[in-house]
Amino acid sequence: MSNEQKCPFSGTHGARTTVGTQSNRDWWPKVLNLNILHQHAPAANPMDADFDYSETFKTLDFGALKQDLYALMTTSQDWWPADWGHYGGLFIRMAWHSAGTYRTGDGRGGAGTGNQRFAPINSWPDNGNLDKARRLLWPIKQKYGNKISWADLMILAGNCALESMGFKTFGFGGGRVDIWQPEEDIYWGAEREWLATSDKPNSRYSGERNLDNPLAAVQMGLIYVNPEGPDGNPDPVASGRDIRETFARMAMNDEETVALTAGGHTFGKAHGAGDPALVGPEPEAAPIEEQGLGWINKFGSGKGIHATTSGIEGAWKPNPTKWDNGYFDMLFGYEWELTRSPAGAKQWVAKDCKPEHLIPDAHDPSKKHPPMMTTADLAMRFDPIYGPISRRFHQDPAAFADAFARAWFKLTHRDLGPKARYLGPEVPAEDLVWQDPIPAVDHPLIEVTDVASLKAKLLASGLSTAELVSTAWASASTFRGSDKRGGANGARIRLAPQKDWAANQPAQLAKVLGVLEGIQQAFNSAQTGGKKVSLADLIVLGGCAAVEAAAKAAGFAVAVPFTPGRTDASQEQTDAESIAVLEPEADGFRNYQKKTYSVSAEEMLVDKAQLLTLSAPEMTVLVGGLRVLGGNVGGSSDGVFTTTPGTLSNDFFVNLLDMGTVWKPAAESAGRYEGRDRQTGVAKWTASRVDLIFGSNSQLRALAEVYAQNDAQEKFVRDFIAAWSKVMELDRFDLK
């Protein structure tokens, strides 16, 4: 008789679990992924339902926490000894790599969620041995508990590392809320191999090194660029081109890029002491007994003098635990000779190094080493743009220190959103243009009676339901939950570049804004006591009034929630280049697509919905409602499945699911479809892929059926208003 026991549930040998089985996406890889709309469910969150991190953070003894972090920097542990007795370089790298996943294209990545704790980021090759940094932090996290999130603690540890080595940081803002499971919405690349070069299958590059959007890193598993050069080619000038594109996609200009590179490499060292083949698997693949630690190294002691991380070995300058101008002294003070580290990585060593510039070994005081530079470092000297900036910083240490302080602050706060979200005693007073500043309210706000009066004026202004709804949606739907940018507050839709975006229908927008500004000026000039209505509020109020009127036309007297308090930003407070990344390439809610893409229109709709923090039901009801309200760009009839446009009816769903209609691709236009009467062949409707996906995809069809039922009209109106109001207030952090 076999000693193998049968599974008590199935009666067969071996437990039957979902591990190893084919998922729906394995069977049907092209099926629309709606899971990204339902991430981070309350059931996955261990915190109490009423837990408020921002309120809890206010009870933190911030000064005591910083003192504990300072002490940590120089308390070396035998299980992972500190280089030169100071963990500063390690914690700077941890914070940098937490923030450095951010990219402007979709605002995803960054330090805002503490996602370095989870796959895939916790196991990226570029994050080697940062698991040890987080374990070193654990006693402090354990001590302060929920008063400080992992996301905030990792960034604050980086600040304290800099400060403990003599650098004055620009400030710190808390407010990053931890997630509890890996994100599913972030596209990190199509490669199936870590560190795959651009000549490998599924490359992120095409043509003449054109990097796939919205990616910023040059290889799968890297934070920025390959330090050895493009695809490992040790060409500093070519590396400079990679660096410029990558850092630009992470919101950094040339000066900020030089400051960050030089400032970060002022501290610590790279590790490549031995054969990388002796380094074990990353944390997600490590044996259970390692308890989440990866990269266990069998070379010597595997740590300290024997540590291998990137494979590059050495420090950039003397005094690696002290802020000074030594990086530039070395960069410009020597010629550099290409060599290989003990781990085989390509790097550069100072030729004929002077004795006073030899760097004591991080763990063996009897040894000294010449400074090293990576190929990416040499780009700071030999790139025609970076070179002059580097020389200016070399000659002006104060300018360098200020530039690095500001760039580091930007790096670590870029995805935290507007300044209103920042917490703690070290928030800088200065407003920075990349924060998309919005003026504070400095006047009495409109009251309930004013709102009613303004609604009446808006509805009597001659503007159509479609014009009012489209303008409000265009203003509010720029919001991105990823980096908390965009939204209706600030009324930047009236400023460059938003006023000229094709999706915003510039001619119609100019007309609508002209009417709204007239109503605004008439109201404000009639007030005593300084009461005002902002254009930002009026834009949203116009949409709300139009929705109410459309619901009334459908037989429902409803009030769409509206809370005043938005203000109007100026053009000087608006960085046009920075705002440009918010322009929609596609917006399925408006049946808009700028051009044809390799990604389907319905996938882009789901991506947009995720950035708007919408659920699948919210996405569904908004599409159906916006279609019948005339929300399509250019007045397109696609998806307008109603004979009463401007009425908030459930006609979109009723007619989409009507089996009396048969759909065929339109002959004249890819991605468009014609719906004809099944019996007579008479043309009835036209539609886009976005429209038809609500009848094609099984999950979305199930939702569409809810709203197409005979008893669904009131629910449809109620749900549409709730979802509409959510979008209108996504950026109202003053209300949260």
From Swiss-Prot:
Q: Which residues form the active site?
A: H97 (proton acceptor)
Binding-site residues for heme b, renumbered to this chain? H265
Indicate whether Metal-binding appears among the record's keywords: yes
Post-translationally, this protein is described as follows, namely: Formation of the three residue Trp-Tyr-Met cross-link is important for the catalase, but not the peroxidase activity of the enzyme.
User: Would the keyword Heme turn up in this protein's UniProt record?
Assistant: yes
Stored InterPro entries:
Catalase_peroxidase, Haem_peroxidase, Haem_peroxidase_sf, Peroxidases_AS
- Name the Gene Ontology molecular function terms of this record: catalase activity; heme binding; metal ion binding
Chain positions of site Transition state stabilizer? R93
Cross-link Tryptophyl-tyrosyl-methioninium (Trp-Tyr) (with M-250) lies at W96-Y224
Region (Disordered) residue spans = 1-21
**Tryptophyl-tyrosyl-methioninium (Tyr-Met) (with W-96) crosslink - at what positions?**
Y224-M250
Which family would the database say this protein is a member of? Belongs to the peroxidase family. Peroxidase/catalase subfamily.
Q: What does this protein do?
A: Bifunctional enzyme with both catalase and broad-spectrum peroxidase activity.
Q: How does it assemble?
A: Homodimer or homotetramer.
Instruction: State the name under which the record lists this protein.
Output: Catalase-peroxidase
Which gene codes for it?
A: katG
